[in-house]
């Protein structure tokens, strides 16, 4: 019993230090846990220091390595397995079955811990004899600035007896980290290596020598050239500044480039200017052509007017001369003319002639009365006329078909040489001007127009006006779309004009004795003149009554026309044939008007035929 008690007490006493150790370990682990919460980098280290089977096996493995290191003399201060990491050892320990780990009881654990403590107490005694051991975490033993490119050269003397690890882990082994890289390199160089290095450097120097010399020479020449250019540029710049006055001096190349650019710009500008000038010339040429056309048209119109008046006067004079010798023929011709209704266009054309030529009606009548000089008619070219378009009056008088050169506006046009021939036969320019009512420049006669309203009305009704250009006329597309429109424009008259013409025709038919060629009435006597005056007054009164509905201007116009048309014999009986002159002249006027109408019709037909072609 005593032995059992002593044995029990010994066990209790042995457990007391173990309990103290465990309590201290728990306290330390508690502190370590607090530190780990603050510094999470220390967790891996703390996991390895917990009392676990892996840790105990690691301690045993370390002891075995120490024993092997003490026995070997070749490498007393270096452990070749210091580079092995802890996970590798854990892997080796992990290969053990779990049953062997769990099979250890508490008593066995106590024995293992006791042995470890004893070994730890024995270590300080052997520590001065040995160098400091390297722990498993070899990274802490290496300095921070140590490079990782140490050569892993295996020396022949270093042959380990116990190689537990496979060859793949030999790469982790390295030379002594405390040995400098320079020392390792110095050990590798030999005299042979140095000799080869010297020869290599010599060869390299020979190869690179000429190229480097050439480069140096080229660099030197370039520097000299640039220096010379800078000096020249500076000198030229100074001289140029002295001459010009502080302006920058450009090199020759830049000056040439600038000159070429300026020349190109100047050429472009000149080309643009020439184009603009050409355009302006074209425009001005077109305007000039238009002005020339207008001038030509005005001249043509003036020449048409002059030639028309001259030919008209010559025809009247010729007709008057032939009328004296053939009174019977003219009387019969007048009877045949006035038996038919008078064309209303003839009367208005007479008025239009007087207004167009700016000749007062009384002067025109005087010209018709006094045209006594016989003038031979001009022999001009004849234009073929279709017989269907010839009126009865034209057929009765074929001698009137001395067709003139038609003008643009439908009136006979005499060429310039015809005017000279007419003047050479006894007429002068002053005579023609006096006949036309246009005196010399020294004594100008104002043109006759009763009022502006009648002038505008007559000019608006005329097919053309004096001085009217093509630009003012209607275009062909408007007034000549086809044959019918042209014919309507040619034949269309005002309603008032038609009424007036019809009334005059009825009056002439109603009173044929006024213009009747009765020889009994043609005997000059005082009683006949009084009867003629009474008839004239009756006609004027009838006209006024009929035209009372019209405007006063038209009434005055018709009254003036009726007054100026000779009805009876004139007062002056200078010659015995004088009473018959007015009637003959009126017949000539009507014949001329009919001839103009026929010529207009022929011109219209010719134009229509040309357009149809």
Swiss-Prot record:
GO terms for molecular function: chemoattractant activity; cytokine activity. It holds the Pfam family Granin. The modification Sulfotyrosine is found at residue 150. Residues 1-27 form the signal peptide. PROSITE patterns: GRANINS_1. It comes from the Eukaryota. InterPro entries: Chromogranin_CS, Granin, ScgII. Residues 67-105, 119-146, 257-287, 546-580 are annotated as: Disordered. The modification Phosphoserine is found at residues 173, 267, 428, 528, 551-552. Residues 28-30 form a propeptide. It is found in: Secreted. The keyword S-adenosyl-L-methionine does not apply. Residues 92-105, 257-283, 546-557 have a biased composition (Basic and acidic residues). GO terms for cellular component: extracellular space; secretory granule. GO terms for biological process: angiogenesis; eosinophil chemotaxis; induction of positive chemotaxis; intracellular signal transduction; MAPK cascade; negative regulation of endothelial cell apoptotic process; negative regulation of extrinsic apoptotic signaling pathway; positive chemotaxis. Keywords: Calcium, Cleavage on pair of basic residues, Phosphoprotein, Secreted, Signal, Sulfation. Belongs to the chromogranin/secretogranin protein family. Binds calcium with a low-affinity. PANTHER family: SECRETOGRANIN II (PTHR15119), SECRETOGRANIN-2 (PTHR15119:SF0). Neuroendocrine protein of the granin family that regulates the biogenesis of secretory granules. Interacts with Secretogranin III/SCG3. This is Secretogranin-2. It comes from Bos taurus (Bovine). The lineage of its organism: Eukaryota, Metazoa, Chordata, Craniata, Vertebrata. The gene is SCG2.
